[in-house]
Amino acid sequence: KEDGYFVTGGTRIAVPEGKLNYLRAQGYINKDIILGIRPEDIHDEPVFINASPETSVKCQIEVAELMGAETMLYTSIEGQSIVARIDSRSDIKPMDTLQLGLDLNKAHFFDKETEARIRP
């Protein structure tokens, strides 16, 4: 973690100011932390990604599982597995590469050593 960004490998993801303030206040800048985000808070819509490009990541889809009204996408960021739940109208197949936008306003951060949630 560096000031203003969650960093994993070569990927930098901007942290919203509100979350950044409580991470700073509790001394978590430049410390290892865990980022948790629910599948429904990961988006493939261009309008979301364009509005917040610093919270989007490029991924290669490993599995795309159509589940009726939604599709579950399985991929990874710098070796860390993630799952995204997107609208089934998106025609995404395994091995496709796409940008996914992370809604970090809804993300949770955890202390790497204790695995306890870092609360505001």
Model-derived features: where do they sit?
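Short aromatic-glycine-enriched beta-strand elements
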Residues: 3-5, 68-74
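Glycine/charge-rich catalytic "coupling/switch" loops of P-loop NTPases
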Residues: 3-5, 9-62, 81, 90-120
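C-terminal helical cap and adjacent loop that interface with cofactors, partners, or active-site loops
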Residues: 65
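Canonical phosphoinositide-binding patch of PH/PH-like domains
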Residues: 84-85
